[in-house]
């Protein structure tokens, strides 16, 4: 299950951009896109409603006879607890069911009534087993605090975990192996998607580290970007991650700091 992130901005332009991303993934990354995740107000900046964006794009693709993708690409909306009370969150969960979505991504609010674990439990209570629940996790799941949080999400009923972006194949392998240990220990069959981040300048990478988004781009990766090996650095990371995904039968999830950045899909890559 290969997934990508897409931020809706203007429906007509979005259609063309998304088609280019899907085609680029197929031709340049060797991946068929299985699902497109629509984020909700990333980095606390207002964006098109995730539910509405996912619904509109899904309907447009289903009506586009020349797209070639409508029968295989799933659109996944995101519900974020940030700034919402319980009633508002329940309303959005009901919207997922009403809209006929088969998956939804869930993000707990830092200051909201429901954290990620409680949000998963509430969604499972309302949606039953009809909808697949997706949530995120820190990369270092072998560390006690992150591991405990992940266990709580797994026990609450999450179906797929997407990790924060990974920049080291060694860290990725350690994460996968520990995830399988947790699966066996808990008797839970949730799926894992490793986060891959398409970043194409050292300046952008430094800004991300300064913003403290919950993950850090390592010095070794920054150094490679500084030395001008932007294309080579990304391709090397992608190939390593793709090989690991095949070896362990897991999935990848591709996003970029500048949303909808076609360079990550081989279109005009540096």
Q: Each predicted region: which residue ranges?
A:
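Catalytic beta/alpha-barrel core
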Residues: 35-47, 80, 102-111, 136, ...
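Extreme N-terminal starter segment of soluble prokaryotic enzymes
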Residues: 1-3
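Catalytic domains of carbohydrate-active enzymes, especially glycoside hydrolases
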Residues: 22-39, 153-158
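Metabolite-binding pocket within alpha/beta catalytic cores that recognizes anionic/polar moieties
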Residues: 35-38, 44-89
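Active-site pocket-lining/capping segments in soluble small-molecule metabolic enzymes
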Residues: 6-24, 28, 105-141, 184-247, ...
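Conserved, mostly hydrophobic/aromatic
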Residues: 36, 96, 153, 157, ...
């Amino acid at each position: 299950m290969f997934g990508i992130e897409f931020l809706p901005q203007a429906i007509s332009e979005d259609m063309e951009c998304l088609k280019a991303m899907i085609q680029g993934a197929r031709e340049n990354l060797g991946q068929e896109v299985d699902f497109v995740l629509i984020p909700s107000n990333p980095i606390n900046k207002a964006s098109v409603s995730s539910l509405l964006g996912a619904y509109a794009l899904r309907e447009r693709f289903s009506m586009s006879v020349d797209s070639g993708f409508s029968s295989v690409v799933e659109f996944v909306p995101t519900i974020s607890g940030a700034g919402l009370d319980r009633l508002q969150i329940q309303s959005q969960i009901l919207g997922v069911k009403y809209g006929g979505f088969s998956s939804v991504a869930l993000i707990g609010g830092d200051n909201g009534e429901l954290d990620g674990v409680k949000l998963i439990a509430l969604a499972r209570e309302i949606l039953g087993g009809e909808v697949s629940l997706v949530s995120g996790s820190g990369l270092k799941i072998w560390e006690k605090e992150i591991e405990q949080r992940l266990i709580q999400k797994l026990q609450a009923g999450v179906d797929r975990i997407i990790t924060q972006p990974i920049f080291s194949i060694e860290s990725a392998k350690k994460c996968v192996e520990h995830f399988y240990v947790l699966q066996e220990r808990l008797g839970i069959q949730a799926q894992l998607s490793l986060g891959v981040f398409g970043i194409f300048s050292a300046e952008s990478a430094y800004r991300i580290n300064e913003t403290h988004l919950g993950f850090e781009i390592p010095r070794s990766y920054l150094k490679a970007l500084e030395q001008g090996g932007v294309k080579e650095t990304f391709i090397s990371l992608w190939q390593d991650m793709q090989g690991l995904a095949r070896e362990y039968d897991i999935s990848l999830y591709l996003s970029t700091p500048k949303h909808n950045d076609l360079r990550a899909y081989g279109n005009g890559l540096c």
